[in-house]
């Protein structure tokens, strides 16, 4: 097994698929349509694609003091144009596996959110919302540390998305 930047042995290998109940997770390049076809093989299109993409922010010296290795790509080396192309590539690769009315979301920071939104718009997705994940502690690294991550959500196609929450269905409560 290959070593990570921390000297620890990597557990997942490129191409590994892990079964998580009825869900699957693949270790691979999300911009590669073949990887996603292999992951989704035999399944109907998904109602949700949820990712935690690299933010195109250098890890070493910015996010941490050296405990973690850099991402394989989009780890601060991409220009704005390259990061937009990266986002277009992974979203475009995911779209054939997302049903009409399906929701796509990716965790990102404030620097990358406009780029994700531009890529989604370029591919015809409809913005649904911007969710803020408020964490209990701020991240490490810079003077202005974020205590949140952003989760922009987009919808594919014209069909309604599935609403399992049903807010307001049984009355409205205001706080």
Tell what function each PLM region has.
Residues 1-175:
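Core catalytic lobe of class I
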């Amino acid at each position: 097994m290959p070593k990570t930047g921390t000297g620890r042995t990597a557990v997942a290998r490129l191409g590994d698929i892990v079964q998580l109940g009825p869900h699957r997770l693949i270790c691979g390049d999300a911009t590669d349509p073949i990887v996603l076809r292999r992951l989704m093989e035999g399944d109907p299109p998904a109602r949700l694609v949820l990712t935690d993409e690299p933010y195109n922010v250098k890890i070493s010296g910015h996010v941490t003091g050296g405990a973690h290795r850099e991402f394989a790509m989009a780890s601060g080396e991409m220009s704005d144009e390259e990061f937009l192309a990266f986002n277009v590539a992974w979203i475009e690769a995911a779209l054939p596996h997302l049903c009409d009315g399906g929701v796509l979301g990716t965790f990102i920071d404030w620097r990358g959110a406009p780029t994700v939104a531009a890529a989604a718009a370029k591919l015809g997705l409809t913005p649904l919302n911007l969710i803020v994940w408020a964490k209990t502690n701020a991240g490490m690294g810079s003077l202005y540390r974020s205590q949140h991550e952003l989760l922009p959500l987009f919808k594919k196609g014209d069909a309604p998305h599935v609403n399992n929450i049903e807010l307001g269905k049984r009355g409205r409560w205001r706080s």
